[in-house]
Amino acid sequence: MKKTGRLELTWVGKYDDKVIEPRILLEDASKSYGDPSSENMLIHGDNLIALQALQQDFSGEIKCIYIDPPYNTGSTFEHYDDNLEHSIWLSLMGERLILLRELLSEES
């Protein structure tokens, strides 16, 4: 007997499209070091905006991405509140995971 159903996570706001203003990445030469011909980048900033900025030039080409997403620990920190409703947190993570998948190369 074949089962054709599939499991899907659903939450409030999952399908709400958000428009984020496009940005470009600017190099800060004072923070660069090492081999100037290196293909590696370290980007300091909001990871969602940075991932979107990478899309135009690097879609499907990146081998490894490390981001520091909101973890939803339930704690409040000095610079941000990490205590979101789960539906809001899932929407935040969903946006980032979709961009990550689009940026990563096949061999990643």
Language-model regions: role of each:
Residues 1-66, 73-88, 95:
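DnaQ-like (DEDDh/DEDDy) 3′-5′ exonuclease domain used for proofreading
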Residues 86-108:
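Conserved Class I SAM-dependent methyltransferase catalytic core
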